[in-house]
């Protein structure tokens, strides 16, 4: 099937695949996502029993009717048909005031609601990676990365920028298939486009330096920076650039990738916010140093993705042809991957939040009801040379601070029935804070040793930007071509090692 070709979307047209069916045809089972757009629910079609995802379009802040971002998303997904892009099935409406999965009325001041119906996917990459004890294998990482790049290459060939690549927007089913989702920030583009685009896109940790420096003219390279961050995150077992704000994000980028200058990045000094955010001192590129535990071919590919100058950043098509995907161990067949219990970022965050609340409640309970102190203590035994009193934590099992240790009287506390002798200087630990456990910094890029490649410990949980249900679309099948040239599938094809897509048989 030939790929669709399209340019700017006509936002005056009514959204496509607008059905006449009501949301009452579905039974909401569980909320699996939430964001600025609304909520995402796992639901079951009552008539067929098919499990789907319902993405509710938030209308309460829209004074002018249907949100333009939703129109863009629907139109783009209607045009995209690929096995690595989420499929939008239909649009349904609710005739009256809508209710959530618990039967409570929502806050929509308008009557009715609008839902996008998507194929259901069991996981998103963030939720899956956050599962305790889960370790991705190297063939598994290669499999996911190959599918991500294939889907993104298809989008770029069809002149669509995703503009929000992150783990929670990469959906995975229990057959190992990965699909790009949440096209709420996506838009079409053309190489001869002269207008300005917003730079307030892409979640901060995955945002490229050109957007952070104020660029308003950009192309597919912005998505490839995000892919590089995802790639390193899979291998490093945690996010690599977790900035708290734009300034800190740029600092982390420059500390890793070096200072930008006119030699390495022509035109950078003319970018709108360069003078505000340029490093105070020259910084050298340290990607190879920070990620020296990576496989050689993985590091070579990552170096080409995390390039400051977008004009020199590798494309999705060229990345698919990298040696990384054509050397052992090869990407595995998606169907060979293990199945897991449903894991979405929204659910894992909710579980962590509940766990924190339980821990805080336990602490409050302990403060309100402290352990009872001993009301009767045996008399102190003194004798021999006196020593400085050690520092003991207060509590029922230790003497009070700044006083000699209290020893109960009685034969059971005598050594072989003889009176206890004078306390020696080494009987108790010295006063002061005792060292124990680890006091390691978890920041930066050198927080410990890592396995040679693949996942070590599970992701370190942390804020990942807005948590959003990532559903976004199109049926599989396409032939690549277009601006990159060629009519076959991307990459080296199936003539190498007689393996289609480079998968092990």
Swiss-Prot record:
Principal EC category: transferase
EC number(s) on file: 2.7.11.22, 2.7.11.23
One Pfam family recorded for the sequence: Pkinase
One BP term from GO: response to virus
Compositionally skewed regions (Gly residues) per UniProt: 482-491
Domain Protein kinase: 26-325
Tissue: Highly expressed in flowers. Expressed in seedlings, roots, rosettes and stems.
UniProt-annotated catalytic positions: 164
Keyword Phosphoprotein: yes
Entry GO MF terms: ATP binding; cyclin-dependent protein serine/threonine kinase activity; kinase activity; protein serine kinase activity; RNA polymerase II CTD heptapeptide repeat kinase activity
Superkingdom classification of source: Eukaryota
Family per similarity comment: Belongs to the protein kinase superfamily. CMGC Ser/Thr protein kinase family. CDC2/CDKX subfamily.
Subunit composition and interactions: Interacts with CYCT1-3.
Protein name: Cyclin-dependent kinase C-1
Upper classification of the organism: Eukaryota, Viridiplantae, Streptophyta, Embryophyta, Tracheophyta
């Amino acid at each position: 099937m030939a790929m669709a070709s399209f340019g700017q979307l006509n936002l005056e047209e009514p959204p496509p695949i607008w059905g006449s069916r009501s949301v009452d045809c579905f039974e909401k089972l569980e909320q699996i996502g939430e964001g600025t757009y609304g909520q995402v629910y796992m639901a079951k079609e009552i008539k067929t029993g098919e499990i789907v995802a319902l993405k509710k379009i938030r209308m309460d802040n829209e004074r002018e009717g249907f949100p333009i971002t939703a129109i863009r998303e629907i139109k783009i997904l209607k045009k995209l048909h690929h096995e690595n892009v989420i499929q939008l099935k239909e649009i349904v409406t609710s005739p009256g005031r809508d209710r959530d999965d618990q039967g409570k009325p929502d806050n929509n001041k308008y009557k009715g609601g609008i839902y996008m119906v998507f194929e259901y996917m069991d996981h998103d990459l963030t939720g899956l990676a956050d599962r305790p004890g889960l370790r991705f294998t190297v063939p598994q990482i290669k499999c996911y990365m190959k599918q991500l790049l294939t889907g993104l290459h298809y989008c770029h060939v069809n002149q669509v920028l995703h503009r929000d690549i992150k783990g929670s927007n990469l959906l995975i089913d229990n057959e190992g298939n990965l699909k790009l989702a949440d096209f709420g920030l996506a838009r079409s583009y053309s190489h001869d486009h002269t207008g300005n685009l917003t730079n307030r896109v892409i979640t901060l940790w995955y945002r490229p330096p050109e957007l952070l420096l104020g660029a308003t003219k950009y192309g597919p390279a912005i998505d490839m920076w995000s892919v590089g961050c995802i790639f390193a995150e899979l291998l490093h077992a945690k996010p690599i650039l977790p900035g708290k704000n734009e300034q800190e994000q740029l600092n982390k980028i420059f500390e890793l990738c070096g200072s930008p200058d006119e030699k390495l990045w022509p035109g950078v000094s003319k970018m709108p916010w360069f003078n505000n955010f340029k490093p105070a001192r020259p910084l050298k590129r340290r990607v190879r140093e920070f990620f020296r535990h990576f496989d050689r071919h993985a590091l070579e590919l990552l170096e080409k993705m995390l390039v400051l100058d977008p004009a020199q950043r590798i494309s999705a098509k060229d990345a698919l042809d990298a040696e990384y995907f054509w050397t052992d161990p090869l990407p595995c067949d998606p169907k060979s991957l293990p199945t897991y219990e449903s894991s979405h970022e929204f659910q894992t965050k909710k579980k962590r939040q509940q766990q924190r609340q339980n821990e805080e409640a336990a602490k409050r309970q302990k403060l309100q009801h402290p352990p009872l102190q001993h009301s009767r203590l045996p008399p102190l035994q003194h004798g021999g040379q006196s020593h400085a009193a050690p520092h003991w934590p207060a509590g029922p099992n230790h003497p009070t601070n700044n006083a000699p240790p209290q020893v109960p009287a009685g034969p059971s506390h005598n050594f072989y029935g003889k009176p206890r002798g004078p306390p020696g200087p080494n009987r108790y630990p010295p006063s002061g804070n005792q060292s124990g456990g680890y006091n390691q910094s978890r920041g930066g890029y050198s927080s410990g040793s890592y396995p040679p490649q693949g996942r070590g410990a599970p992701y370190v949980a942390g804020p990942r930007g807005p948590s959003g249900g990532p559903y976004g679309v199109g049926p599989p099948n396409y032939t690549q071509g277009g601006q990159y040239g060629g009519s076959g599938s991307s990459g080296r094809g199936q003539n190498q090692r007689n393996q289609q897509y480079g998968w092990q048989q």
